[in-house]
Amino acid sequence: SMSPDGDTITLSSLKGKKTKLIYFWASWCSFCEEENTDLVRIYKKYKSKGFEVYAVALDEDKEEWLSSINKYKLAWINVSDLQGWDSKYVNTYNVSATPTTYLLDKENRIVAKDLIGYELERELESILNYTGPVN
């Protein structure tokens, strides 16, 4: 999908990042306002440790999408095909509401769904601080 600058950024390009959150949201989604604020805080805290957010907006209006990105200062990866609920991601990830989140591991496998706030932080702590089995 396209970034605001028109670049195509794929999820597969994020392989190797320790963990990433696919975040389905939209500028018209009132429940996403709180989620945006919370995620921005969590993103700032864990970004340097290998956490990335891949935010897929189910918007159709590019101006509204961009205006929301600026309003909430969403500095992570923002993409949208501006197809709303007809977005290919909706089927691929079985999204039926916004916000919906999937936490992915290094290999882009889904490890958790719809974790927010403290629960998300706890999971991130566990993933990002895991150094592998002790020999």
Can you say where each PLM-predicted feature lies in the sequence?
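The conserved SAM/SAH-binding core of class I Rossmann-like methyltransferase domains
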Residues: 24, 54-58, 79
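Structural microenvironment flanking redox-active thiols in thiol-disulfide oxidoreductases
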Residues: 33-72, 84-90
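Non-globular targeting/processing and membrane-anchoring segments
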Residues: 134-135
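Short active-site neighborhood of thiol/selenol oxidoreductases, capturing the structured segment around
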Residues: 10-33, 39
